[in-house]
């Protein structure tokens, strides 16, 4: 009898990749994935434990799985959280779960599954696609290049949950990228906790790819991904890029995108968090000494098509009105294309909880609202400049009203969309996963309307 596993995946793209690894192993061993709790022999819940709302969502999901199914294995970042007395947080709230593991723990999860639901005798490993099992649509996928983080930002507990930086071998990463492109992926989203630090933990060790030596470092990785993507007429999007000086080296590759139409996109997701030097110092941000505004302006000079996304925190402990106004001015001068903002929320175990002068809740929320109003105004004005221009659009889905997709400046789920009107020729149909060219005819908030 084939064992059926229910699966719940919560949290960030890194956690999603962990879920994909577990599901790939389950498929390789002959297990099936159940569509609902009632049809599952047991349920795996991959949790998030970064901020309080994520903890609540994860605990609620565990409780629901226990109520609906009764047999639950928990993995992910929340699995690494402990109570003040050192006891397991999850087991203290949900003592009936079968097992608890931390993040990136595929082997431990599989051992727990084997214990409570022995694997089928005939695994049919040849039925697993070379690219593995993916939770994203077939035309885009996340590529995790490293695990953990060496930074000790005061608002963050990721290092205590996921450990220090561990870079994957560059040959292994590039092989996975090639297999994903060969499986039909048209957009590869590079993720990690710090993409710019790739290889620093192993002193940029020399690896091998395509029979040639290649350094385990950011530029060499991006350069190779750029070449592979062009060969497969696909895109590569970089996330979690810290603004270190060596990031300058990849801007020429991005500037070439307009000539080829494929390769590494002129898009950088940079987790800046703030702009004022004193706030960055209290946050213990790794780039607090960098002149971020000057660097961003230089990047735009080197690559005029560059789109920058970033996230920020409003109301961090000790933040004054003057420091917040400094952040708003930075946002205006840097012309951040896509910006998100969180009102600071204390995270259990974070060093920031010990800082003086906490900002009142109402002030935090008021500053977040002011930030988002400014960010939206900048984004809308920058999008309006695209009206009348030809853009590439990756089609995410098709309906009776045409196609819905994204430009090179839009990452899935977090940025804007493009509504492409139906083709003028009745015989023409858009296809999910194809990259088309369209003319922007109007903008609506964060989104665009285009026609072919």
Swiss-Prot record:
GO terms for cellular component: cytosol. Residues 3-118 form the MTTase N-terminal domain. Residues 384-452 form the TRAM domain. Its EC number is 2.8.4.4. [4Fe-4S] cluster 1 binds at residues 12, 48, 77. It is found in: Cytoplasm. Residues 135-381 form the Radical SAM core domain. One of its GO terms (molecular function) is protein methylthiotransferase activity. It is an enzyme of class 2 (transferase). Disulfide bonds: none annotated. Catalyzes the methylthiolation of an aspartic acid residue of ribosomal protein uS12. HAMAP family: MTTase_RimO. This is Ribosomal protein uS12 methylthiotransferase RimO. It comes from Polynucleobacter asymbioticus (strain DSM 18221 / CIP 109841 / QLW-P1DMWA-1).
